[in-house]
From Swiss-Prot:
Cytoplasmic side: 1-7, 65-70, 146-153
Task of the protein: Catalyzes the polymerization of lipoteichoic acid (LTA) polyglycerol phosphate, a reaction that presumably uses phosphatidylglycerol (PG) as substrate. Is required for staphylococcal growth and cell division process.
Source organism (scientific name): Staphylococcus haemolyticus (strain JCSC1435)
Gene that this sequence comes from: ltaS
Site (described: Cleavage): A217, S218
Keywords for the protein's UniProt record, in alphabetical order: Cell membrane, Cell wall biogenesis/degradation, Manganese, Membrane, Metal-binding, Secreted, Transferase, Transmembrane, Transmembrane helix
Main location class: membrane
Compartment annotation: Cell membrane
Pfam family, one: Sulfatase
Modification after translation (UniProt): Proteolytically cleaved.
Membrane topology per record: Multi-pass membrane protein
Protein name as it appears in the record: Lipoteichoic acid synthase
Amino acid sequence: MSLHKKKISLFAFFLLTVFTVTLKTYFSYYVDFSLGVKGLVQNLILLMNPYSLIALILSVFLFFKGKKAYWFIFIGGFLLSFLLYANVVYFRFFSDFLTFSTLNQAGNVESMGGAVGASFKWYDFVYFIDTIVYLFILIFKGSWLDKRVFSKKFVPVVMAASVALFFLNLAFAETDRPELLTRTFDHKYLVKYLGPYNFTVYDGVKTIQNNQQKALASEDDLTKVLNYTKQKNTTPNSEYFGAAKKKNIIKIHLESFQTFLINKKVNGKEVTPFLNKLSTGNEDFRYYPNFFHQTGQGKTSDAEFTMDNSLYGLPQGSAYSLKGDNTYQSLPAILDQKQGYTSDVMHGDYKTFWNRDQVYKHFGIDKFYDATYYDMSDDNIVNLGLKDKPFFKESAEYQSKMKGPFYSHLITLTNHYPFTLSEEDADIDKPNTGDSTVDGYIQTAHYLDQALEEYVTDLKKKGLYDDSVIMIYGDHYGISENHNNAMEKLLGEKITPAKFMDLNRTGFWLKIPGKEGTVDKTYAGQMDVMPTILHLVGIDSKNFLMFGTDMLSKDHNDVIPFRNGDFITKDYKYVNGKAYSNKTNELLETQPKDLDKNKKQVEKDLEMSDNVLNGDLFRFYKNPDFKKIDPSKYEYKTGPKGNQK
């Protein structure tokens, strides 16, 4: 055997570097990153996802000649290892992954520097041991390297194989988590399904797109939006303006709740007996049966976003994920600056989901009680996170220790797709539609109703009920059009496109201290909540940019736009380019007189709101009634229960 055959060929060095960097990445998945990996498919994806980009990047250096090619591969491998370790350190400190936007924030970079020493682990040498070995070979054992030119005709084959592997990885990821790239739920999800290197590329592309849109925006764009939204200003209802000044505000988010459940019975038993009682008008709550969600692909995050900012979500993706670093004039920040409210969010999932740990800083939210503040033992968890009953119980305890006035937002989880519940927690029989999603939905909605009743009882016991504004709302539909056949069996009627729009009613219940309950049939949407609450506490909404109008005002605009351009009014609905009667859901033979005007208004609303987000226009807004939020002043620490994944 000749001497050169015993040497390390360039291709062998390439393969070895790809293998060791991938091995370190795989090590980080199970030792340092809490990715919540479950099942064979997710483990297979995890095994697959680092290879493609590592191989694609390093294969470029196979075009070079001699020792220089070895050095380039080494440097490429080192930079990938450095990126991996930087993410490891950042994750240990922030439970999240590095993005270009976080690197642009000085506070994060400074924290990163301090975090290295504080979070160093004894096994961290694993991330660089191969680097040390390769460096030793390149400097001291150059004779081990085969200097012959590598055949370049194989390089495109290697690159093509890397690209093919990426698309195979993406296909598996989309199968296990549909709409992964469009909805961008959580950085952890993206890393779990794509790997840290592909995530960095994805984040870079999104950052460039956002920066380009921002660069083209100007103060003139903001002026156009302000001139448009000023036309929406409503005169406050004198009976309600200031009626809840400096009262605590409790906002309760009912996951995937739709109002077809109200007064619905299954096998003779009410699905939501407590909410049924609140919907009569005989209790303390003002019930809006014609309240619609206005979410897009961001679903839950869109509902939060719209209700706290009176802006629409994006046409694609989630504003939380894609526009989380924008400047905002949010409801909690206005309440703080004008009336001294503190604000918090309570949620039985971890803070990085939907990028909440970053977005909330830009909303000026003071505290985030995420899963690390709750008992996340196995008995308390179902589906995506903490069950609603223990969630509400622990949340009420936290709230009882708060000083008012506070704005507290509780986000439930149990009534979430795929609507699974243990036999122990299920207190109503499933219907027999033949569709496990629809059948399960009845059980989880019933459980949610029970949990809500227990929570309201706790508020009364702790003295928080009487003097608080309480909002209860459904965030978005739970049952999609894919389940129309089962829904027809459950409801006993045909689900037409017009009927499906009716099913987008998610309900809104509003308790105002000192005011009697009623059933208010006003047509309204999530966009209208922010101006309504501002007027209730005595803050005029005309001083702020909003697309919604006060539901209690006589000037309220009852044209309710949806993110896809459809809309509904008190008389008719516009679905897929056709107008239907609200009373009969039949196609209208004569076009409503105000149809064209309303279509233009809806299109303009969506366009203007998109301009605000894409151009980050609030950064230009010099509002004398509002001081810009400084996100660096907010930090959401890990709770006393810690990360229990």
